[in-house]
């Protein structure tokens, strides 16, 4: 959790401000971990994506969605809230840091659309 990472980092760490690059390289590792049921799973703790990396990546998804939307289709994005908030910021054409101001709860949906030529949030956190 964010609190655990902050504690390991020395008491202060905020994903939106510090990003994954601020974390210690010693936390990066590749190996296998054992789940409570005994199953062994591969684990790769890498540097992660920066906010700008995700912001660029979601543009690719938007680029694929827009032609479908323009031809009358609906498009469904399923992802973690963090990514969906960044996608929304990109959709609106605002700074990616704006995404931290968008609350998106677990198992909720939002609708992004176009209204009078502008990309808008039609519904949020429903």
Residue positions per predicted region:
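A generic secondary-structure signal
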Residues: 60-68
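Acidic, low-complexity terminal tails and accessory targeting/binding regions
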Residues: 1-7, 52, 67, 71-73, ...
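Alpha-helical elements of the RecA-like P-loop NTPase motor core of helicases
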Residues: 63, 85-86
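GST superfamily/GST-like fold recognition
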Residues: 81-85, 115
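Generic beta-sheet signal
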Residues: 73-82
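Phosphate-handling substructures
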Residues: 1-57, 123
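Conserved short-loop catalytic and cofactor-binding motifs
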Residues: 42, 46, 75, 100
